[in-house]
UniProtKB/Swiss-Prot annotation:
UniProt-recorded name of the protein: Serine hydroxymethyltransferase
Residue(s) carrying N6-(pyridoxal phosphate)lysine: 229
Enzyme class: transferase
Main location: cytoplasm
Cofactor(s) the record lists: pyridoxal 5'-phosphate
A Gene Ontology molecular function term of the record: glycine hydroxymethyltransferase activity
HAMAP family found in the cross-reference section: SHMT
Complex formation: Homodimer.
Source species of the chain: Prochlorococcus marinus (strain AS9601)
Gene Ontology biological process terms, A to Z: glycine biosynthetic process from serine; tetrahydrofolate interconversion
Pathway annotation: One-carbon metabolism; tetrahydrofolate interconversion; Amino-acid biosynthesis; glycine biosynthesis; glycine from L-serine: step 1/1
Length: 423
Protein backbone atom coordinates (compact mmCIF):
# COMPACT_ATOMS: atom_id res chain seq x y z
CA UNK A 1 0.00 0.00 0.00
CA UNK A 2 1.36 3.39 -1.00
CA UNK A 3 0.07 5.72 1.70
CA UNK A 4 0.90 8.95 -0.10
CA UNK A 5 -0.67 7.66 -3.31
CA UNK A 6 -3.91 7.07 -1.39
CA UNK A 7 -3.70 10.59 0.00
CA UNK A 8 -2.99 12.02 -3.43
CA UNK A 9 -6.15 10.41 -4.75
CA UNK A 10 -8.42 11.25 -1.81
CA UNK A 11 -7.16 14.77 -1.06
CA UNK A 12 -4.82 16.08 -3.75
CA UNK A 13 -4.75 19.58 -2.23
CA UNK A 14 -3.30 18.39 1.10
CA UNK A 15 -1.05 15.94 -0.75
CA UNK A 16 0.42 18.77 -2.80
CA UNK A 17 1.03 20.87 0.31
CA UNK A 18 2.86 17.96 1.96
CA UNK A 19 5.02 17.49 -1.12
CA UNK A 20 5.74 21.21 -1.19
CA UNK A 21 6.84 21.09 2.45
CA UNK A 22 9.03 18.08 1.73
CA UNK A 23 10.68 19.98 -1.13
CA UNK A 24 11.14 23.02 1.11
CA UNK A 25 12.92 20.94 3.73
CA UNK A 26 15.13 19.36 1.08
CA UNK A 27 16.17 22.67 -0.50
CA UNK A 28 16.61 24.82 2.61
CA UNK A 29 19.17 24.91 5.40
CA UNK A 30 17.20 24.35 8.61
CA UNK A 31 18.80 26.37 11.39
CA UNK A 32 15.81 26.87 13.69
CA UNK A 33 17.17 25.66 17.03
CA UNK A 34 13.95 23.93 18.07
CA UNK A 35 13.67 21.82 14.92
CA UNK A 36 15.18 18.55 13.78
CA UNK A 37 14.50 15.75 11.29
CA UNK A 38 12.89 12.65 12.78
CA UNK A 39 13.95 9.28 11.44
CA UNK A 40 11.78 7.36 8.99
CA UNK A 41 11.14 4.80 11.74
CA UNK A 42 9.81 7.51 14.06
CA UNK A 43 7.54 8.84 11.31
CA UNK A 44 6.28 5.35 10.49
CA UNK A 45 5.31 4.80 14.13
CA UNK A 46 3.42 8.07 14.38
CA UNK A 47 1.66 7.39 11.09
CA UNK A 48 0.51 3.92 12.15
CA UNK A 49 -2.85 2.34 13.06
CA UNK A 50 -2.15 3.29 16.68
CA UNK A 51 -3.76 6.63 15.87
CA UNK A 52 -7.10 4.77 15.97
CA UNK A 53 -6.81 3.68 19.62
CA UNK A 54 -8.24 5.53 22.62
CA UNK A 55 -6.53 4.70 25.92
CA UNK A 56 -7.43 7.03 28.78
CA UNK A 57 -5.48 6.24 31.93
CA UNK A 58 -2.14 4.52 32.49
CA UNK A 59 -0.94 1.11 31.28
CA UNK A 60 -2.89 -1.67 33.01
CA UNK A 61 -5.26 1.00 34.43
CA UNK A 62 -7.27 2.04 31.40
CA UNK A 63 -10.85 3.19 31.08
CA UNK A 64 -11.22 1.44 27.71
CA UNK A 65 -10.87 -2.12 26.49
CA UNK A 66 -8.55 -3.35 23.77
CA UNK A 67 -5.47 -1.66 25.22
CA UNK A 68 -3.25 -4.72 25.62
CA UNK A 69 -0.85 -3.71 22.84
CA UNK A 70 -0.76 0.02 23.50
CA UNK A 71 -0.08 -0.88 27.15
CA UNK A 72 3.02 -2.80 26.04
CA UNK A 73 4.14 0.09 23.86
CA UNK A 74 3.64 2.75 26.52
CA UNK A 75 5.38 0.67 29.19
CA UNK A 76 8.32 0.20 26.84
CA UNK A 77 8.45 3.94 26.17
CA UNK A 78 8.49 4.60 29.92
CA UNK A 79 11.29 2.11 30.56
CA UNK A 80 13.39 3.48 27.71
CA UNK A 81 12.90 7.07 28.88
CA UNK A 82 13.95 6.15 32.42
CA UNK A 83 17.05 4.36 31.15
CA UNK A 84 17.97 7.17 28.78
CA UNK A 85 17.90 9.87 31.47
CA UNK A 86 18.76 7.72 34.51
CA UNK A 87 15.39 8.50 36.10
CA UNK A 88 13.24 6.37 38.39
CA UNK A 89 9.88 7.57 37.07
CA UNK A 90 8.57 8.88 33.75
CA UNK A 91 5.29 9.92 32.16
CA UNK A 92 5.36 9.81 28.36
CA UNK A 93 1.83 11.10 27.77
CA UNK A 94 2.21 14.92 27.60
CA UNK A 95 1.32 16.16 24.13
CA UNK A 96 4.01 18.85 24.29
CA UNK A 97 6.57 20.49 26.52
CA UNK A 98 4.03 23.16 27.42
CA UNK A 99 1.57 20.46 28.49
CA UNK A 100 4.27 18.81 30.59
CA UNK A 101 4.99 22.12 32.32
CA UNK A 102 1.29 22.74 32.92
CA UNK A 103 0.95 19.33 34.58
CA UNK A 104 3.86 20.11 36.90
CA UNK A 105 2.32 23.45 37.87
CA UNK A 106 -1.01 21.76 38.60
CA UNK A 107 0.73 19.26 40.90
CA UNK A 108 2.98 21.61 42.84
CA UNK A 109 1.25 25.00 42.87
CA UNK A 110 -1.93 26.82 43.72
CA UNK A 111 -3.14 29.93 41.87
CA UNK A 112 -1.26 32.96 43.16
CA UNK A 113 1.86 31.04 44.22
CA UNK A 114 5.18 32.61 43.26
CA UNK A 115 7.25 31.01 40.51
CA UNK A 116 10.69 32.12 39.39
CA UNK A 117 12.11 31.57 35.92
CA UNK A 118 14.36 33.31 33.45
CA UNK A 119 13.02 36.43 31.75
CA UNK A 120 11.78 35.58 28.26
CA UNK A 121 13.88 38.33 26.70
CA UNK A 122 17.02 36.84 28.26
CA UNK A 123 16.39 33.35 26.89
CA UNK A 124 13.57 31.93 29.00
CA UNK A 125 10.34 30.41 27.72
CA UNK A 126 6.72 31.53 27.52
CA UNK A 127 5.65 28.78 29.92
CA UNK A 128 8.07 29.93 32.62
CA UNK A 129 5.95 32.86 33.75
CA UNK A 130 5.49 35.09 30.73
CA UNK A 131 2.52 37.45 31.26
CA UNK A 132 0.95 36.30 27.99
CA UNK A 133 0.98 32.65 29.08
CA UNK A 134 -1.19 30.87 31.62
CA UNK A 135 1.90 30.47 33.83
CA UNK A 136 2.13 34.26 34.11
CA UNK A 137 -1.60 34.78 34.51
CA UNK A 138 -2.34 32.17 37.19
CA UNK A 139 0.84 32.57 39.22
CA UNK A 140 2.90 35.42 40.62
CA UNK A 141 5.84 35.22 38.24
CA UNK A 142 9.19 36.79 39.08
CA UNK A 143 12.19 36.59 36.82
CA UNK A 144 15.96 36.43 36.81
CA UNK A 145 18.26 37.19 33.89
CA UNK A 146 21.86 36.97 32.81
CA UNK A 147 24.82 39.15 33.69
CA UNK A 148 25.01 42.22 31.44
CA UNK A 149 28.74 41.86 30.81
CA UNK A 150 28.99 38.09 30.26
CA UNK A 151 25.42 37.17 29.17
CA UNK A 152 25.76 34.17 31.50
CA UNK A 153 23.88 33.17 34.63
CA UNK A 154 24.95 35.01 37.78
CA UNK A 155 24.06 32.82 40.74
CA UNK A 156 24.69 35.55 43.30
CA UNK A 157 21.97 37.64 41.63
CA UNK A 158 19.66 34.64 41.28
CA UNK A 159 20.10 33.83 44.97
CA UNK A 160 19.32 37.43 45.97
CA UNK A 161 16.06 37.41 43.98
CA UNK A 162 15.07 34.03 45.43
CA UNK A 163 15.76 35.18 48.99
CA UNK A 164 13.67 38.31 48.46
CA UNK A 165 10.73 36.78 46.55
CA UNK A 166 10.59 33.34 48.23
CA UNK A 167 9.25 31.42 45.21
CA UNK A 168 7.49 28.10 45.67
CA UNK A 169 8.95 26.86 42.38
CA UNK A 170 12.23 27.76 40.66
CA UNK A 171 12.56 26.92 36.97
CA UNK A 172 15.85 26.41 35.15
CA UNK A 173 16.25 25.45 31.50
CA UNK A 174 15.86 27.82 28.58
CA UNK A 175 15.00 28.41 24.93
CA UNK A 176 17.90 30.67 23.96
CA UNK A 177 20.75 30.15 26.43
CA UNK A 178 23.92 28.81 24.78
CA UNK A 179 25.87 27.93 27.91
CA UNK A 180 25.99 24.97 30.31
CA UNK A 181 23.45 25.05 33.15
CA UNK A 182 24.74 24.46 36.68
CA UNK A 183 21.82 22.51 38.16
CA UNK A 184 23.61 21.91 41.46
CA UNK A 185 23.85 25.65 42.15
CA UNK A 186 20.12 25.99 41.45
CA UNK A 187 19.48 23.13 43.89
CA UNK A 188 21.40 24.93 46.61
CA UNK A 189 19.34 28.09 46.11
CA UNK A 190 16.06 26.16 46.02
CA UNK A 191 16.93 24.40 49.27
CA UNK A 192 17.84 27.70 50.93
CA UNK A 193 14.43 29.23 50.18
CA UNK A 194 12.39 26.02 50.48
CA UNK A 195 11.37 25.90 46.82
CA UNK A 196 10.70 23.07 44.43
CA UNK A 197 13.17 22.94 41.53
CA UNK A 198 12.07 22.13 37.99
CA UNK A 199 14.36 21.81 34.99
CA UNK A 200 12.94 22.28 31.51
CA UNK A 201 15.53 20.67 29.25
CA UNK A 202 13.51 20.82 26.03
CA UNK A 203 16.42 22.23 24.05
CA UNK A 204 19.26 20.19 25.50
CA UNK A 205 17.58 16.82 26.15
CA UNK A 206 19.59 15.03 23.48
CA UNK A 207 22.84 16.42 24.88
CA UNK A 208 21.84 15.38 28.40
CA UNK A 209 20.94 11.89 27.16
CA UNK A 210 24.37 11.69 25.51
CA UNK A 211 26.06 12.80 28.76
CA UNK A 212 27.46 15.88 27.03
CA UNK A 213 25.58 18.23 29.36
CA UNK A 214 25.06 17.74 33.13
CA UNK A 215 21.97 15.71 33.98
CA UNK A 216 19.40 17.62 36.07
CA UNK A 217 17.75 14.45 37.43
CA UNK A 218 19.97 14.15 40.56
CA UNK A 219 19.40 17.80 41.50
CA UNK A 220 15.81 18.63 40.51
CA UNK A 221 12.47 17.60 41.94
CA UNK A 222 11.06 17.23 38.45
CA UNK A 223 12.34 17.50 34.88
CA UNK A 224 10.31 18.26 31.77
CA UNK A 225 11.29 18.15 28.13
CA UNK A 226 10.06 17.91 24.60
CA UNK A 227 10.92 14.84 22.58
CA UNK A 228 11.94 16.55 19.34
CA UNK A 229 14.68 19.22 19.12
CA UNK A 230 18.06 17.63 20.03
CA UNK A 231 16.36 14.35 21.02
CA UNK A 232 15.23 13.93 17.39
CA UNK A 233 11.90 12.25 18.13
CA UNK A 234 8.29 13.15 17.37
CA UNK A 235 6.73 16.37 18.60
CA UNK A 236 5.68 15.66 22.18
CA UNK A 237 6.45 16.05 25.87
CA UNK A 238 7.92 14.03 28.74
CA UNK A 239 8.09 14.34 32.55
CA UNK A 240 10.88 12.69 34.58
CA UNK A 241 11.67 12.28 38.29
CA UNK A 242 14.40 10.72 40.41
CA UNK A 243 11.84 9.92 43.15
CA UNK A 244 9.27 7.43 41.86
CA UNK A 245 6.80 8.09 44.68
CA UNK A 246 7.02 11.85 44.17
CA UNK A 247 6.59 11.34 40.44
CA UNK A 248 3.27 9.57 40.82
CA UNK A 249 1.55 12.85 41.71
CA UNK A 250 2.23 14.06 38.17
CA UNK A 251 0.35 11.11 36.65
CA UNK A 252 -2.98 12.54 37.80
CA UNK A 253 -1.97 16.02 36.72
CA UNK A 254 -1.45 14.77 33.18
CA UNK A 255 -4.66 12.69 33.17
CA UNK A 256 -7.27 13.73 34.07
CA UNK A 257 -5.73 17.02 35.21
CA UNK A 258 -4.67 18.62 31.93
CA UNK A 259 -5.29 16.06 29.18
CA UNK A 260 -7.74 13.42 28.02
CA UNK A 261 -6.68 10.38 26.04
CA UNK A 262 -2.98 10.00 25.24
CA UNK A 263 -1.74 9.93 21.65
CA UNK A 264 -0.55 6.33 21.50
CA UNK A 265 0.84 6.68 17.97
CA UNK A 266 3.06 9.51 19.23
CA UNK A 267 4.01 7.51 22.32
CA UNK A 268 5.12 4.68 20.03
CA UNK A 269 7.20 7.16 18.06
CA UNK A 270 8.71 8.42 21.33
CA UNK A 271 9.66 4.85 22.22
CA UNK A 272 11.38 4.47 18.85
CA UNK A 273 13.26 7.74 19.35
CA UNK A 274 14.34 6.75 22.87
CA UNK A 275 15.76 3.50 21.51
CA UNK A 276 17.63 5.44 18.82
CA UNK A 277 19.04 7.79 21.47
CA UNK A 278 20.27 4.82 23.51
CA UNK A 279 22.54 3.71 20.66
CA UNK A 280 26.26 4.64 20.63
CA UNK A 281 25.96 6.51 17.33
CA UNK A 282 23.57 8.98 18.94
CA UNK A 283 26.41 10.12 21.21
CA UNK A 284 28.52 10.66 18.10
CA UNK A 285 25.68 12.69 16.62
CA UNK A 286 25.37 14.85 19.74
CA UNK A 287 29.11 15.43 19.83
CA UNK A 288 28.94 16.62 16.23
CA UNK A 289 26.04 18.95 17.06
CA UNK A 290 28.23 20.76 19.60
CA UNK A 291 31.32 20.78 17.36
CA UNK A 292 29.28 22.27 14.54
CA UNK A 293 27.82 24.96 16.79
CA UNK A 294 31.27 26.01 17.95
CA UNK A 295 32.51 26.26 14.37
CA UNK A 296 29.44 28.23 13.31
CA UNK A 297 29.92 30.65 16.20
CA UNK A 298 33.64 31.17 15.59
CA UNK A 299 33.09 31.68 11.85
CA UNK A 300 30.56 34.44 12.48
CA UNK A 301 32.73 36.05 15.17
CA UNK A 302 35.65 36.13 12.73
CA UNK A 303 33.42 38.03 10.30
CA UNK A 304 32.64 40.69 12.91
CA UNK A 305 29.23 39.47 14.08
CA UNK A 306 28.84 39.31 17.85
CA UNK A 307 27.63 36.10 19.49
CA UNK A 308 25.78 36.31 22.81
CA UNK A 309 28.11 35.12 25.62
CA UNK A 310 30.96 34.93 23.12
CA UNK A 311 30.26 31.37 22.01
CA UNK A 312 28.29 28.25 22.84
CA UNK A 313 28.37 25.02 24.83
CA UNK A 314 25.36 23.43 23.15
CA UNK A 315 23.51 23.56 19.81
CA UNK A 316 22.42 27.21 20.05
CA UNK A 317 24.24 30.14 18.46
CA UNK A 318 22.59 33.47 19.26
CA UNK A 319 23.69 36.40 17.11
CA UNK A 320 23.67 39.93 18.56
CA UNK A 321 23.13 41.97 15.41
CA UNK A 322 23.67 45.33 17.06
CA UNK A 323 27.32 44.76 16.14
CA UNK A 324 26.38 45.22 12.47
CA UNK A 325 23.55 47.72 13.02
CA UNK A 326 20.81 45.31 11.97
CA UNK A 327 17.60 43.99 13.55
CA UNK A 328 16.62 40.37 13.91
CA UNK A 329 13.55 40.96 11.77
CA UNK A 330 15.66 42.15 8.84
CA UNK A 331 18.26 39.41 9.30
CA UNK A 332 15.58 36.73 9.37
CA UNK A 333 14.21 38.04 6.07
CA UNK A 334 17.65 38.28 4.47
CA UNK A 335 18.66 34.69 5.22
CA UNK A 336 15.22 33.38 4.24
CA UNK A 337 15.74 34.87 0.77
CA UNK A 338 18.70 32.52 0.28
CA UNK A 339 16.89 29.41 1.60
CA UNK A 340 18.16 29.55 5.18
CA UNK A 341 15.53 29.09 7.88
CA UNK A 342 16.19 30.73 11.26
CA UNK A 343 14.25 32.94 13.66
CA UNK A 344 14.56 36.46 14.98
CA UNK A 345 15.10 36.42 18.73
CA UNK A 346 15.57 38.86 21.56
CA UNK A 347 19.00 39.14 23.11
CA UNK A 348 19.65 40.04 26.76
CA UNK A 349 18.87 43.71 27.47
CA UNK A 350 17.42 44.07 23.98
CA UNK A 351 16.25 47.62 23.14
CA UNK A 352 13.98 46.30 20.37
CA UNK A 353 10.51 44.80 20.75
CA UNK A 354 9.91 41.02 20.46
CA UNK A 355 8.43 41.68 17.02
CA UNK A 356 11.67 43.29 15.82
CA UNK A 357 14.50 42.08 18.12
CA UNK A 358 18.25 42.55 17.92
CA UNK A 359 19.08 38.87 17.58
CA UNK A 360 18.96 35.87 15.29
CA UNK A 361 18.83 32.41 16.85
CA UNK A 362 20.54 29.53 15.05
CA UNK A 363 20.76 25.85 15.95
CA UNK A 364 22.85 23.01 14.55
CA UNK A 365 20.76 19.92 15.41
CA UNK A 366 18.81 19.57 12.15
CA UNK A 367 21.67 20.03 9.71
CA UNK A 368 23.85 17.71 11.77
CA UNK A 369 21.17 15.07 11.22
CA UNK A 370 21.61 15.66 7.48
CA UNK A 371 25.32 14.89 7.89
CA UNK A 372 26.81 18.38 8.05
CA UNK A 373 30.28 18.43 9.64
CA UNK A 374 32.58 21.24 10.79
CA UNK A 375 33.72 22.12 7.27
CA UNK A 376 30.15 22.32 6.05
CA UNK A 377 29.16 24.52 8.98
CA UNK A 378 32.10 26.81 8.34
CA UNK A 379 30.64 27.31 4.87
CA UNK A 380 27.18 27.88 6.37
CA UNK A 381 28.65 30.56 8.61
CA UNK A 382 30.38 32.25 5.68
CA UNK A 383 27.14 32.25 3.66
CA UNK A 384 25.22 33.83 6.54
CA UNK A 385 27.92 36.46 7.04
CA UNK A 386 28.10 37.26 3.33
CA UNK A 387 24.33 37.73 3.21
CA UNK A 388 24.03 39.83 6.36
CA UNK A 389 27.03 42.03 5.61
CA UNK A 390 25.88 42.71 2.03
CA UNK A 391 22.11 43.11 2.36
CA UNK A 392 21.64 45.18 -0.81
CA UNK A 393 23.97 43.25 -3.12
CA UNK A 394 21.82 41.16 -5.48
CA UNK A 395 24.82 39.34 -6.96
CA UNK A 396 25.97 38.15 -3.53
CA UNK A 397 22.38 37.19 -2.71
CA UNK A 398 22.24 35.01 -5.83
CA UNK A 399 25.63 33.46 -5.06
CA UNK A 400 24.60 32.71 -1.47
CA UNK A 401 21.46 30.91 -2.62
CA UNK A 402 23.51 28.90 -5.10
CA UNK A 403 25.92 27.86 -2.34
CA UNK A 404 22.99 26.85 -0.13
CA UNK A 405 21.54 24.63 -2.87
CA UNK A 406 24.97 23.06 -3.42
CA UNK A 407 25.13 22.14 0.27
CA UNK A 408 21.58 20.76 0.17
CA UNK A 409 22.49 18.53 -2.78
CA UNK A 410 25.67 17.43 -1.02
CA UNK A 411 23.76 16.41 2.11
CA UNK A 412 20.36 15.14 0.90
CA UNK A 413 17.53 14.83 3.41
CA UNK A 414 16.70 11.15 4.04
CA UNK A 415 18.98 10.35 1.06
CA UNK A 416 15.98 9.48 -1.10
CA UNK A 417 14.78 6.80 1.33
CA UNK A 418 11.55 8.56 2.26
CA UNK A 419 9.66 7.57 -0.88
CA UNK A 420 10.72 3.94 -0.61
CA UNK A 421 9.67 3.67 3.02
CA UNK A 422 6.03 4.48 2.35
CA UNK A 423 5.38 1.98 -0.43
Amino acid sequence: MNILQNLKESDPVISNFINSEKNRQETHLELIASENFASIAVMQAQGSVLTNKYAEGLPQKRYYGGCEFVDEIEELAIQRAKKLFNANWANVQPHSGAQANAAVFLSLLKPGDTIMGMDLSHGGHLTHGSPVNMSGKWFNAVHYGVNKETSELNFDEIREIALEKKPKLIICGYSAYPRTIDFESFRNIADEVGAFLMADIAHIAGLVASKLHPNPIPHCDVVTTTTHKTLRGPRGGLILCKDAEFGKKFDKSVFPGTQGGPLEHIIAAKAVAFREALQPDFVNYSQQVIKNAKVLASTLINRGINIVSGGTDNHIVLLDLRSINMTGKIADLLVSEVNITANKNTVPFDPESPFVTSGLRLGTAALTTRGFNENAFAEVGEIIADRLLNPDNSLIESQCKERVLTLCNRFPLYEGKLEASIK
